[in-house]
Amino acid sequence: MENTRKIVTFGEIMLRLTPPANRRFDQSPVYEVTFGGSEANVAVSLANYGVRSEFVTCLPANKIATAAVEDLRRNGVETGRIVRGGDRMGLYYMEKAASIRSSQVVYDRAGSSFDALRPGMIDWEETFRDAGWFHWSGIAAAVSADTAEVCAEAIGAARRLGLTVSCDINYRKNLWRYGKTAREVLVPMMGECDVLFGTDDEYATVAGIGVPTLKNREASDKLDPADYEAAARETAARFPNCRMAVFALRNVLNANHHTVSGTLSTEGRLLTTRVYEIEPVVDCVGVGDAFVGGIIYSLHAGRTPQQALDFGAAACALKNTVPGDYNRMTVEEVDALVGGSASGRIAR
């Protein structure tokens, strides 16, 4: 039977400004403008796959914010619970990487409408009325002490109502500026989650769990499950409510050449998937969100954990080929890659 319950994501959507043609910030008289943000990116992925998804945030009552809302709606995301308030929308500037030059990101989000969000401003009981899953990330909790409280408020309501709760650790060191560490804030909330997502660095930095890094240089290399079993056991012991822990693995050989893979631990089993090699990388922003969205979609649709991991890794790999924050791949396209279609030939 089809799962018709919606998936709710919560976080900040921002205006992204990018110099075209791999230019540096000081080289370009014009910037390409798009919208994005981790939790919004996940909502768009889910909508692309035909799942009811709703994005909850706080935005100012101005035309730029309205354009962001309309962009979400065009991509199939429900927006009826977005709160309007505050004075400005958060921005971020993205200088794209090239070869041995790394990407650069400059945030301009202090004092944004999302920053002004306070507990009690969102009716979570009503928001979750016909929902089956709630997804949040560490970015939302990093913006301010108040937004962290709103995250905790939402998690509590979701658990009371029996929703599946997932968290992407999404550690951003430059955002944690309000006097508490990510570990202090996130670990208690992670303990209330059913599904955890994160990279090797994020599990180590935030939860103190050592996860081996991806060393693969070739797509033909395979992951050794034994390398990740200790981390899986430690995560299960540290977070007993967690039914599933997902490790996103990426090796950046240079800005244009990445390998991606992942592992998933559940019920004492550790699952691995193939390693994907991406060269050239078109845009690496949002690839982790594509991974998360692919796995949530698969589990929501009743696929097995192994199928979910395979689908998520393939979605992550494909997002590297798409400009912008959003993953615009279809279920059929992702499934085709899982099935071995990676030639890049014209589909006629």
Label every model-predicted segment.
Residues 1-24:
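Positively charged, low-complexity intrinsically disordered leader regions
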Residues 24, 41-52, 298-301:
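Alpha-helix C-terminal capping segments
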Residues 24-42:
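Short catalytic helix/loop segments, enriched in acidic residues and glycine
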Residues 52-139, 334-348:
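Conserved N-terminal subdomain of the carbohydrate kinase-like
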Residues 53, 79, 165-166, 197:
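Hydrophobic beta-strand scaffold residues
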Residues 157-164, 239-243:
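A short helix->loop->beta-strand "cap" motif at the edges of active sites that frequently abuts
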Residues 175-269:
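Conserved phosphate/ATP/ADP-binding segment of small-molecule kinases
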Residues 255, 270-341:
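Conserved post-catalytic alpha-helical subdomain immediately downstream of the catalytic base
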